Amino acid sequence: MEFTLQQDKVRALDDDMLVVKSESGGAGLDRGDDESQYPHGLKLAVLMTCVFIGMFLVALDKLIISTATPAITNEFHAYSDVGWYGTAYLLTNCATILLFGKLYTFLDVKATFLSAVLLFEVGSAVCGAAPNSIAFIVGRAIAGLGAGGIQEGVLVIIVCAIPLSKRPAYQGLFGAVYGVSSVIGPLLGGAFTTHVSWRWCFYINLPFGGLVALAVFFLLKVPGGGAMKSSWKHKVKELNIEGLVALLPGVISLCLALQWGGFTYSWSNWRIILCLTLGLVLLIAFIFIQVWRPKTATVPPHIFCQRSIFTGFWVSALLGAHQTIIIYFLPIWFQAIKGDSAVQSGIHLLPFVIAIVVSSILTGVGTTKTGYYTPFLIIGTVTAAIGAGLFLLLQPHTTTGQWIGYQIVYGFGLGGCYQAPNVAAQTVLSKDEAPVGTALILFATTLFGAIFVSVGQNVLDQQLATKLAGLAGFDITPQQINTAGVTGLFQMVPQGLHNAVLYAYNSALRRTFLVGLILACLTILGSLGMEWRSVKKEQQKQQEKAMENEQEEAAKTQKHKYALDTDENFGV
């Protein structure tokens, strides 16, 4: 009897200690923002450099394939598979971001990140060594799985390695890296394809990915490893399986519809209607599941409904949408209207890249100094909207100085927007919930970016078909325009109509940029709704809360120890 009672009390002590650990840090991420516990100097510099290299590779992989695709299709003789080369990566990347956001809250942070890097490396190796088109597509899908974990993992590592008051500067670098890689990707893809082989677009990931893995393995230290102290049965329950069953196929179905619609199949095709319907139904089901089971939800309702998280989601979704439209269709303007090659059009985006980098760094430094990120977000969204509006002024006779100026204004605005939603998530949420918040922000950017590439392309095709229909002796469908490509359209028209087609193409592109302008203006509403919270004040609150938790934990431990000692003394 004495032994049984003693066992029960020890078990109660262990259970209470488990609860205290969970409350004080959840996933073991909480250091109380005592800056002495974070890495410093060379160790921090090497860790963050390598982590950002990983982010650069993931973002690079989205667009590096754009200029390599012709060489890949020529080698595999699989022209019907072209759409899958980009879609396979996008589907798995977008579908797993929220999943990894949940995993980082209760699994070992280092092990989870390294697993994502391994998936990305395996996928890259399969792509580089692919003997046929099917193997290449499988490799792209595997790489996309890892990419979702790396993207979210970089933000989690920033939380683990850097105190809150200093994170904005690194978040600024995060935005700069993402923006630079989005533009440099096609340039590197073209360079590798022309001078070495398209396979090096993917082999290049292997040594750099290995460097990232080594740096994280040896330099990243997370209290308790970041893993929730609970059984695997409890961890599986925390995974919200029923929610994932709705989320993953829902996102995949929606992305498939958007990738195929208007390109591979018409929007009225049964496949597109089925994918759209299935995707929307499953995503609605996912939302209901989150409300129904909030304790194990992938995205707990109390997180999404928090004011800064909701407005951050709004800003990120619309930001991802309008920046994708501008980045995707501005090179088309250079190629179709100015006669640039694909590589030249990429080079002409360098003013945009430089503006993003400078603005991101300045915004990060400014936020670190003042403690407030909301004013920079408001200024950034307004400036980006002005820049998006300037693209409506583009004409065939637009001078070099003008289009450079338009890019600088727009890029400077974007640089001021990138970091605020993520910093807000890390500021208003506890450290164990921050991965879910940042994953939600990334998911919004990725999903809406994918949606509005398709929207923009369909606007361009429809507008161009309408404007060309008015030309005497010339009739063309949106499908024929899409098949002809950027410059192929001019080869389909009589020489005497080239100038008219040029102005029609320019007008259609301006209508597409108008979509970007509308989205950029709507982004301002989200920035105005963002809470004014200081990272400096929140860090102080976290330090005080961490101290209180430590005192409560010590008191609870002492209380149970006293209870056990008392029972022993009385022979219970």
From Swiss-Prot:
Molecular function as annotated in GO: transmembrane transporter activity
Compartments where found: Membrane
Annotated keywords: Membrane, Transmembrane, Transmembrane helix
Biased composition (Basic and acidic residues): 539-556
Region (Disordered): 539-572
Cross-referenced PANTHER family: AFLATOXIN EFFLUX PUMP, PUTATIVE-RELATED, MAJOR FACILITATOR SUPERFAMILY
Family the UniProt entry places it in: Belongs to the major facilitator superfamily. TCR/Tet family.
Function description: MFS-type transporter; part of the gene cluster that mediates the biosynthesis of an emodin derivative that may be involved in black Sigatoka disease of banana.
UniProt-recorded name of the protein: MFS-type transporter MYCFIDRAFT_190113
